[in-house]
Amino acid sequence: MSKKAYIFLADGFEDIEGLTVVDLLRRAGIDIKTVSIKETTQIQTSHGITMLTDTTFTETSFTDADILVLPGGMPGTKYLAAYKPLTDLLTDFNNKGKKIAAICAAPSVFSGLGFLKDKKATSYPSFMEVIAKDGAQPSEDSVVTDGNITTSRGLGTAIDFALSIIEQLESKEKADEIAESIVYKR
């Protein structure tokens, strides 16, 4: 049975951070669904690209999820942080030790919910102070996994972020295979 992932998209999400994860996880055979937090599946990225998600939050049950993923970008990250049904779901997953992941500005959603207290984490450089104030142990590593939480720095680390998720859900061999297939050196 293939692993199941959901990535949550709001208007203003960072195109590459969101879609790189979707692309690479699908290449790895992981069933990842794009989820709009709006009432409609139409989303506009931070760079003005209009796209349709697979589903909306209210139409979806996440009981089969192996991981929940947040892309960064502004103002998308602010919208994700303000959407209570999502923060409630993330809190439930974190409390159960289930995998959650965020990149760029989005680790601030986790830190704002108290998830990063005393955990090693990373984020976009201008958000490092934010996550540190919320109790995280900031790292400049491209991708950091501490327990059930994975964080990454930004657009330039999106491939490493996606490969880390593949490695966690499938295997290092599968992540290496995907990296080789896209001519990417890990």
Label every PLM stretch briefly:
Residues M1-I100, V109-G112, D118, V130-E140, ...:
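Extended, subdomain-level signal for the structured scaffold at the beginning of enzyme domains
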Residues T145:
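Cytochrome P450 catalytic-domain "roof"
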